[in-house]
Every structure is written in C-alpha cells, then in structure tokens.
Curated annotation (Swiss-Prot):
UniProt superkingdom: Bacteria
Residues where D-apiofuranose binds: N39, D115, R116, D162, T163, N164, R168, N218, D243, Q263
Main function: Part of an ABC transporter complex involved in D-apiose import.
Keywords: Periplasm, Signal, Sugar transport, Transport
Family named by the database record: Belongs to the bacterial solute-binding protein 2 family.
The name this protein goes by in its record: D-apiose import binding protein
The UniProt record lists the keyword Oxidoreductase: no
Gene Ontology CC terms, in alphabetical order: periplasmic space
Knockout consequences: Disruption of the gene does not affect growth on D-ribose and D-ribulose as a carbon source but decreases growth with D-apiose.
Locations listed in the record: Periplasm
Signal sequence, renumbered to the chain: 1-26
Chief localisation class: periplasm
InterPro entries per record: Peripla_BP_I, SBP_2_dom
Length: 313
C-alpha cells in the first residue's frame, strides 16, 4: 500500500533512561509496546516515546511483545485493563496485529503505530514509519559503489512476517539488479537476530569463499555478519546495514562495516506521542494515517554525527 505523507525529521540526540512502571490504574496513561529492547532500535523507540509522554504529563506503561503475536495480544489486554488513553505500538507482524488493534479501538483506546505498518487503514489513528524503500535504495546505491559494480554478494533479510523486511529487500534489488556483474549467491533470513546472522554468515562463507559483499536488512544482522567474517579472517568483505545504530556507527569508524542507513527511531516515537496527545485532548487526527519519514545514508563521512538514530548538528 502506498504511503502518502512525509514528516520532517527532527534531530533528537539525547536519550533518557526508561522510567518506573505505571500505577495499576492511571487516569492519564500511555502504553508503549515494542519488540525486545536488546535491539537498540526498539529500545530507542521506547525511550523516545516515554520521554515525550512524561514531558507532556502522562504516566507510562512500557512493555515488550518480543515479536510474538500472542504476547502482543496479552500486553494490549494489559493496556486496556489499565485504562490507557492511547497505545504507541511497534507491532509483532502486520497480519497478526489487525485484530489486536481493533480490540483496543473497540475498547475506546486509539493506537499509533511506529516503524512497522499494517495493510489495513481505519483501525489505527496513525502509522508513522520510516521510508524503508527510499532508505534501502540509498543503502543499495552505496553498496554498488563500494563493490565497484561487480562481484558475488549475499543478502541477509529480516522476519518474513515483518513488512519492512520485504520492502527493504525490494528496494535493494531495484538498484542492485541493474548491475549484471553483481551476483547474488545467497539470500537467507536471520530474523533480525545477530546470533542467527553470525551462524548464517558462517554457512554462506563456507559455501561461497569468493564472496565480496553482504547487504543486510538491519544493523543487528550486519553486526553478526561482520563478526563472523572477522572471525574467519575476511576483513576484505564489504558489509552494509540498515538502522543507524551506535554499534554500527562505531564499527564504521573502526573500519569494519562500511555503511548503514539511519531511520529515525527516536523521532518517530516522539511524534507518535505528540499525535496521541492531540487526539486525547482534542480528538485531533493527522491529515494522513500513513506517514513517512525519510532515511539518511551513514558512512565514514558522517558517522561521527550519528547518535542514537539521529544526526547531531
């Protein structure tokens, strides 16, 4: 489904620590639900949303669904039971999420989605996501340049249930496939996991010792790939990621991973809370439900400016 609106990216450089749990029932509560916080992208979302909610005077209930649709349903039930005024959600899968959001809507609780869209409109008040296709094309263009437009490469993709995995892969291939001397020799899902990416990269490398590059659907998998390559003494292999994490920033500065694409996790979450606040207070809805935020290429030229999914001035 085509996304129709772009938001201006504001630089949010500082990150506040996660606060304490909300009271059992709060008259002004915003629930913040994301995948597990061991991924720095999802942690930044939660921290950004909580910081903005507290700034606006709300109590917060921060929960994780761990990319499990059943657990997502349970934590949304918790938000409903606590009387949340709004839910900020990075969901556990486009198809599995529709019923959960509808359940919240039927209970009078509006949902504001971040990062991952669903394929249905009119259930969530807003869907604020990165322009994954635009970002993937940026990353692919840099990858082609780094590869010198030729050589064998592998692709690590994310969870199949996550729409972002497919959008990013399509964006990559719509650029790379125009270069016939770039040969895809392996394409495997590592489910956004660093551990899985390490294991998959070991297997790919054994089967394709002449591999020259790896393009990854997120930074966590890119970190797993670079670790496996370095363990095998293959520091010559080009790795490009997607997210803009501090870990990959540091790897770029150290000469490991060559590039990534920053998506504004912290800013997305804060904008979602601002829109939730406007809805709670005035029933104000955004002009467009689906809203895009552009991504930014990060490489050795600007890695110093990257801090927690935002560029410092």
């Amino acid at each position: 489904m085509k996304l129709t609106r772009r938001l201006t990216l504001a630089a949010f450089a500082s990150v506040l620590a996660l606060g304490t749990a909300a009271p059992a029932f709060s008259a002004d509560l915003i629930a913040i639900i994301t995948p597990a916080h061991d991924n720095p992208f999802f942690k930044a979302e939660a921290v950004g949303a909580e910081a903005k909610a507290k700034e606006l005077g709300y109590d917060t209930l921060v929960m994780s669904h761990d990319d499990d649709a059943n657990k997502q349903s349970e934590v949304i039930d918790t938000a409903i039971g606590r009387g949340a005024k709004a839910i900020i959600l990075d969901n556990a899968g486009a198809d599995a999420t529709v019923a959960a959001i509808k359940k919240a809507k039927d209970a009078g609780i509006p949902s504001f989605l971040i990062d991952r869209e669903i394929n249905v409109t009119g259930i969530a008040v807003a869907q604020i996501v990165s322009n994954n296709y635009q970002g993937a094309q940026l990353g692919a263009q840099e990858f082609v340049k780094l590869m010198g437009e030729k050589g064998n490469y592998a692709e690590l993709v994310g969870r199949e249930a996550d729409t972002n995995a497919g959008i990013r892969s399509q964006g990559y291939h719509d650029v790379i496939d125009d270069y016939p001397d770039l040969k895809l020799v392996a394409k495997q899902s590592a489910n956004w996991s660093q551990t899985e990416a390490y294991a998959k990269m070991e297997t790919i490398l054994q089967a394709n010792p002449d591999i020259k590059g790896v393009i990854s659907g997120n930074d966590t998998m890119a970190m797993g790939a670079i670790a496996a390559l370095q363990a095998a003494g293959r520091k010559d292999v080009i790795v490009v990621g997607f997210d803009g994490s501090n870990d990959v920033r540091d790897s770029i500065k150290a000469g490991g991973i060559k590039a990534t694409v920053m998506q504004p996790a912290y800013a997305q979450a804060q904008i979602a809370v601002q829109q939730a606040d406007a809805y709670i207070k005035n029933k104000t809805v955004p002009k467009d439900e689906k809203q895009l935020m552009d991504c930014v290429l990060i490489n050795a030229d600007n890695a110093d400016k990257l801090e927690t999914f935002a560029l410092k001035n």
